[in-house]
């Protein structure tokens, strides 16, 4: 496999052009996706504590994963010049079992690598980065097959994917900033209650926590409209390049070249 240096600015420009020509509005699809995720988050917040609360939290997390798969599949269709309706968001239900299994297995491997040190955990996360894309493209493959394909596809591209994420970090930080601030305040007050018995406030800035959570979710939705479809489409461009140069998936290439992020491993 020969990897190549990907022209990131060009990929972003091409993604923007593709999204402008999409037959179904990317902003409309993003708004629907983020609104559904926000609704699931609020449902989880209403679930309370105890067994029922845990069950609702797990269920909403799984549903969010299905919606995320559907959004990526929409972006895949955009890159192919195909029409993908709003119902594409729910296409992940057709292979939800494999989707859940893939998340569990990759999370398990990443946790194992993270136990060695922080950096191996990060590298492992990038090693399995394309596994979900392989599964979305071909739901007939097995979970371990998707993971193995991703391991071969990401050889030579982990560092480039890391730089890609850094290039969108400002947008991600902007989208999550209000939620991070609210979470920090809530964590601080809960700690004070546990240690010193000081009751945690039920409101912040004169508003109930649930209302603030809703406001933070709307903020995240609005910011996501500005960058999220482009980010996914650019990530898919990297995936397509990795498939072509690795010969795994579509295309074929010569023998492998390794970079410093790609030491062979026997675990995951």
Language model regions located:
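Hydrophobic alpha-helical membrane segments
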Residues: 1-268
């Amino acid at each position: 496999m020969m990897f190549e240096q990907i022209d990131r600015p060009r990929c972003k420009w091409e993604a923007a052009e593709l999204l402008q020509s999409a037959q179904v509005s990317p902003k409309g699809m993003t708004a629907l996706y983020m609104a559904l995720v926000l609704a699931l988050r609020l449902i989880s917040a209403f679930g309370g504590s105890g067994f029922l609360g845990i069950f609702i939290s797990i269920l909403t997390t799984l549903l969010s994963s299905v919606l995320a798969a559907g959004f990526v599949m929409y972006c895949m269709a955009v890159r192919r010049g195909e029409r993908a309706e709003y119902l594409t968001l729910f296409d992940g239900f057709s292979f939800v079992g494999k989707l859940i299994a893939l998340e569990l297995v990759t999370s398990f491997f990443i946790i194992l690598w993270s136990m060695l040190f922080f950096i191996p955990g990060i590298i492992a996360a990038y090693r399995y980065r394309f596994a979900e894309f392989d599964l979305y493209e071909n739901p007939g493959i097995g979970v371990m097959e998707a993971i193995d394909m991703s391991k071969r596809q990401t050889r030579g591209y982990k560092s480039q994917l890391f730089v890609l994420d850094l290039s969108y970090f400002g947008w991600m930080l902007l989208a999550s900033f209000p939620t991070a601030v609210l979470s920090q305040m809530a964590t601080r007050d809960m700690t004070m209650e546990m240690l010193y018995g000081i009751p945690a406030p039920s409101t912040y800035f004169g508003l109930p926590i649930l209302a603030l959570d809703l406001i933070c979710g709307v903020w995240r939705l609005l910011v996501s409209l500005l960058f999220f479809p482009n980010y996914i489409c650019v990530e898919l461009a990297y995936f397509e390049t990795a498939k072509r140069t690795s010969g795994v998936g579509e295309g074929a290439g010569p023998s492998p070249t390794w970079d410093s992020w790609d030491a062979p491993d026997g675990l995951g």
